[in-house]
């Protein structure tokens, strides 16, 4: 058998001559003599050694200890490894040990540190401008960084404005457009079955939302195209998957790893393909504007692409970055809403006695005000569903998508009113699962109580306007808090109730024989429903044609 050494693979040219002294050095000979197992061990030692050296560069908030060590003997690299699967427990115990007593603590991830502040500081977020504590920059750090999100992110605030702006009633227009598309989505996506059938309900809800949200963002023609449906179904999966991987790696590895991830390859490809969606949208919008300017009626519904083109201070920037901008809107709009609906259905199957109560409320509202959108616009119709609102609040309390939210990035040095100093560059977060573990926030927190919010609203007229789904409060941080709370929360809650009021009226759901509520998956700060979970579904007898 022919034997090769390192130099035989370099040829006999100049490169081999230059490298010959290096390859023949005692150090190189020692490296080349290592077994594969020894080589892996050496690599890991160098990897974690360099990672440890970079820890001193992390921004430190005075008085905030690192939490999560088993003991003082545990090395930091082991804590960082454990954090991937134990984050939920570490966050909960840190809240009880420090936050309850008014003190901050630090979560030490592989890529960065998060300083977790007590809930008392949340109230100040209302008055702190984005220029000091930024949600946008925090999201950029959490969902990647300049390497992970290169060419896949835009710091322009136009996607936030297009969702939150309502000067000309465009939110109502968007909801009406989505309501119409919902009818088509139900016909295409929901199974028309009279007998109990096992279905992937999460996938079904995801695709219904992909069509509805697509109608709002890119319009009717685009939202039904195979290109859009593929983008909506798979881009978010790769986006979240890439983010999870990057969070589990030291930041110094990101420039190397970002180009090796298959998720990143697929994201880039779909971003290029998105041009085939946005270019026709731009053309249709331009043609509709020209005809309207001439007084010609056109069959064209306003959408978010058109709003951005009409209202952007730099139209050319929008044209150049439109695929990125629509994806920034799509990812949170469809993904988290689908999770919320799926979790509610899981809870309803776990507590089936509530099915008849929710159905009665839906039928009563339907009988009094007609079908949604007929006599009342969607945003007003769904406000009549008080019991469904409270049921969703409780379901979301126990199945939130993230255990740390809101987040803020310190753009500059900042000091809270009580003197807590936050240095520039610090990443801040709050424990959003506090209402799962703190009896002072939610009495008997382990109990599923669908009337928890409903009872609070009955106390007084003032309280009746509070404790609503999607309404940020010190007790409910799921949608953030303050002036930078989730801008699309009202649209999301309206769409969620729109979908649930229809499918609960038309369909029955239950677990399969021997099946219980699927367990959530905890990974880093993410709380994810079991993607393999299925439900049994059939059309209600009154709905069977």
From Swiss-Prot:
The chain crosses the membrane at residues 30-50, 322-342. InterPro entries: Cyt_P450, Cyt_P450_E_grp-IV, Cyt_P450_sf. The keyword Transport does not apply. It is found in: Membrane. Glycans are attached at residues 5, 276, 393, 476. CDD domains: CYP503A1-like. Pathway: Antibiotic biosynthesis. SUPFAM superfamilies: Cytochrome P450. It is a multi-pass membrane protein. It comes from the Eukaryota. Coiled coil: none annotated. The keyword Iron applies. One of its GO terms (molecular function) is oxidoreductase activity, acting on paired donors, with incorporation or reduction of molecular oxygen. Its cofactor is heme. Its EC number is 1.-.-.-. Keywords: Antibiotic biosynthesis, Glycoprotein, Heme, Iron, Membrane, Metal-binding, Monooxygenase, Oxidoreductase, Transmembrane, Transmembrane helix. Heme binds at residue 486. GO terms for cellular component: membrane. Gene3D superfamilies: Cytochrome P450. GO terms for biological process: antibiotic biosynthetic process; secondary metabolic process. Belongs to the cytochrome P450 family. Cytochrome P450 monooxygenase; part of the gene cluster that mediates the biosynthesis of sordarin and hypoxysordarin, glycoside antibiotics with a unique tetracyclic diterpene aglycone structure. First, the geranylgeranyl diphosphate synthase sdnC constructs GGDP from farnesyl diphosphate and isopentenyl diphosphate. The diterpene cyclase sdnA then catalyzes the cyclization of GGDP to afford cycloaraneosene. PANTHER family: CYTOCHROME P450. This is Cytochrome P450 monooxygenase sdnB. It comes from Sordaria araneosa (Pleurage araneosa). The lineage of its organism: Eukaryota, Fungi, Dikarya, Ascomycota, Pezizomycotina.
